[in-house]
């Protein structure tokens, strides 16, 4: 007999460290954080320009 055939199934398939839903939540939280880091500075610049240049409020 081979040594591979004598190995129990639990040893061949390791258990996941984290559940699937935890991994999905981490990925979603990362997407939300990265999106806010990209959009918040741009929004702050648009609001600043609209307040400091009221004549050009329509064109940013």
From Swiss-Prot:
Membrane topology value: Single-pass membrane protein
Top-rank lineage group of the source organism: Eukaryota
Native source species: Homo sapiens (Human)
Upregulating conditions: By NGF.
GO molecular function, a single term: identical protein binding
PANTHER family attached to this UniProt entry: SMALL INTEGRAL MEMBRANE PROTEIN 3 (PTHR37859:SF1)
Record has Glycosyltransferase as a keyword: no
Keyword annotations of the record: Membrane, Transmembrane, Transmembrane helix
Transmembrane residue ranges: 20-40
Major location category of this protein: membrane
Name of the protein in question: Small integral membrane protein 3
Keyword Transmembrane: yes
Site, Cleavage: residue positions: 19-20
GO CC entries: membrane
Subcellular location: Membrane
